[in-house]
């Protein structure tokens, strides 16, 4: 019982504990379904933090009355979901640190698309389902203190299809020679 994102992270940390205790390498993929509809089930305390926020400055279209109220409510719920993910990522990092494995653990943080509502996408056009940058450009953060200096930025184009070959390359796994995949490191 509990909020889904919390449950996913709890299970991942239990799996990591078992792997570390058994002195085994581990791979954990935590795919939160947040922020995503349905938006009714969000942590109440986090929702309360955002429920009175006016989100109209980040909307790409002016809304009024009921439409603005409904969009503000939805965005408050999305903000609560994002905050919950942030808190869980923080818990995960603290957990890895406490286990003594953070330094040599690769953590990749990414999402799959832009917003599917009238939310701000910077100076980019489009949103989810659009092939414009506002619909397809998304962050990919790579954390590996033992090998990657913090603060580095890259403008290299990549996609989810590139994650597996990049991880295999980073871990010096030669499997791509015998089992080629699409994507590149």
What does each of the following model-derived ranges do?
Residues 183-185:
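Catalytic-site signature of metal-activated, phosphate-bearing donor transferases
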Residues 1-181:
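Active-site-proximal cap/lid insertion segments
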